[in-house]
């Protein structure tokens, strides 16, 4: 079962069916069931392991909502040997690859046609446990904070009952790939056209109506694109919101994609890296938000712990490096493949 951004009721029903029929569940952070006990952490990394997936490829995938975050998920849905069924209560549904062979308004039309295969399900769980250990070992290797580790550690450090707003591009994908799902944290993300506009405004608005502490994790370009969202009207309430910004001075996601290849190194920085050259701490302070920089896991924990009792808005900036993050992504992929080698 693959669950993307979409109606929470359909997502909950899908997760219940996954439990009932021992179906592996891969749910994106904004799906509404990311924290479900059956959701496989790092499911996208698991699907990205070619050899392991070849031995455990499903015959059928049930899709709920609009999954957009992962190339391995998209590749699975595009596989001609996999039957793709979509659940949608609306007359329009997400099917970018045009691969769905059946669309039903609810899971009543998607009952299993074969006995429950508990052993196959347990094989997915064992593989997920191996992957989790492998990625944690890689993330804990460098002494400082990377953007990848930041995504995992921010989610882990949030107090129960928190709201977490995720920016598009790398942060939401890092949380999807690397963070341990939390059932006691509400996760929101603007997945519409997957753009970065308006994320600060979204976080401020959501924080103002949330009964509890609120946090946002967004990249530096996302932060800069909605900078005036930090402006609060005179007499308006201030949100209890902490915005955490991994700042790699530009569009770091492209360093992990095809434009980041060595043959494009001459033009990469100007065309794709798009450096802004701004210190985001004084930028945030100029708009009235307390802001400070952290560089170690302990400083991050202290910053998030301190935010719980302060109330009001604040910005936490973590400097990262685009090229180093790309290298780390390759190390994570290699570690996952090694962990799954020979696993039945």
Q: What name fits each language-model region?
A:
Residues 3-97, 181-212, 224-231, 295-297:
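Glycine-rich, anion-gripping cofactor-binding loops and their flanking helix/strand elements
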Residues 9-10, 71-72, 153, 174-175, ...:
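Phosphate- and divalent-cation-binding pockets in alpha/beta enzyme and binding domains
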Residues 59, 101, 162:
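Conserved acidic residues
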Residues 18-19, 53-58, 78, 155-160, ...:
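Flexible, charged surface loops at secondary-structure boundaries
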Residues 125-211:
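Active-site diphosphate/adenylate-binding microenvironment
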Residues 84-122:
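Terminal amphipathic helices with adjacent charged low-complexity linkers/tails
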Residues 2-4, 63-65, 87-88, 167, ...:
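Short beta-strand segments
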């Amino acid at each position: 079962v693959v669950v993307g951004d979409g109606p929470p009721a359909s997502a909950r029903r899908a997760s219940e069916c996954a439990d009932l029929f021992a179906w592996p569940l891969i749910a994106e952070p904004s799906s509404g069931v990311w924290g479900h006990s059956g959701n496989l952490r790092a499911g996208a990394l698991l699907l990205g392991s070619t050899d392991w997936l070849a031995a455990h490829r499903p015959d059928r995938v049930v899709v709920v909502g609009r999954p957009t975050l992962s190339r391995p998920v998209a590749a699975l849905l595009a596989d001609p040997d996999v039957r793709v069924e979509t659940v949608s209560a609306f007359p329009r549904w997400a099917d970018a690859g045009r691969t769905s062979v059946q669309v039903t308004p609810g899971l009543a039309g998607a009952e299993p046609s074969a006995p429950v295969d508990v052993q196959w399900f347990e094989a997915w769980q064992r593989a997920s446990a191996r992957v989790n250990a492998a990625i944690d070992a890689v993330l804990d290797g460098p002494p400082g904070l990377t953007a990848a580790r930041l995504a995992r550690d921010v989610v882990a450090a949030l107090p129960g009952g928190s709201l977490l707003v995720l920016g598009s591009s790398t942060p939401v994908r890092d949380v999807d790939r690397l963070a341990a799902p939390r059932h006691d944290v509400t996760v929101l993300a603007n997945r519409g056209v997957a753009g970065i506009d308006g994320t600060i405004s979204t976080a401020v608005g959501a924080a103002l109506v949330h009964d509890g502490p609120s946090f946002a994790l967004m990249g530096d370009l996302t932060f800069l694109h909605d900078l005036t969202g930090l402006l609060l009207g005179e007499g308006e309430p201030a949100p209890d919101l902490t915005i955490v910004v991994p700042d790699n001075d530009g569009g770091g996601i492209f360093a992990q994609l095809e434009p980041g290849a060595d043959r494009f190194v001459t033009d990469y920085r100007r065309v794709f890296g798009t450096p802004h050259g701004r210190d985001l701490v004084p930028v945030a302070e100029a708009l009235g938000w307390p802001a400070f920089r952290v560089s170690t896991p302990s400083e991050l924990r202290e910053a998030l712990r301190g935010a719980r009792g302060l109330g009001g808005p604040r910005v936490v900036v973590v400097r990262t490096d685009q090229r180093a993050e790309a290298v780390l992504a390759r190390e994570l992929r290699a570690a996952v493949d090694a962990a799954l080698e020979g696993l039945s």
